[in-house]
Amino acid sequence: MLRKAIADIEAKYLRTDLPEMRAGDSVRVHTKIKEGDKERIQVFEGVVIAYRKGAPGSSMFTVRKVSYGVGVERMFPVHSPRIDKIEVVGHGGVRRSRLYFLRNLQGKAARLHQEEGPGAADAAHAAPTPA
């Protein structure tokens, strides 16, 4: 009975606008940052290297990017109110659920093969076409 009451309370705070994503996807996470009395949106773009699904309120995903030659990883709670939106930019073709091996790779070796899909098509149109 107590578990049902807790589940009912948690259900109000769960996000319903989540895109379909998995490890290997390139994502753009828009987070709300509070600086003093102002609030702004900061974008963190990278590859999902882990997606931990657990109880509805405890799901998390880890995004990795390389910034100025330094690898940066950030963990996000899926249902966090600090996340404004999550955009899937492309789908990477991987056969693993945890891509921790990317930490040891550099340059072209760290790239993932991009699969064709709705997110990948949008990214392809954004790139300039060679003349």
Curated annotation (Swiss-Prot):
It holds the Pfam family Ribosomal_L19. The keyword Ribonucleoprotein applies. InterPro entries: Ribosomal_bL19, Ribosomal_bL19_sf, Translation_prot_SH3-like_sf. GO terms for molecular function: structural constituent of ribosome. One of its GO terms (cellular component) is cytosolic large ribosomal subunit. It comes from the Bacteria. GO terms for biological process: translation. The keyword Magnesium does not apply. Keywords: Ribonucleoprotein, Ribosomal protein. This protein is located at the 30S-50S ribosomal subunit interface and may play a role in the structure and function of the aminoacyl-tRNA binding site. HAMAP family: Ribosomal_bL19 (MF_00402). Belongs to the bacterial ribosomal protein bL19 family. This is Large ribosomal subunit protein bL19. It comes from Anaeromyxobacter dehalogenans (strain 2CP-C). The gene is rplS.
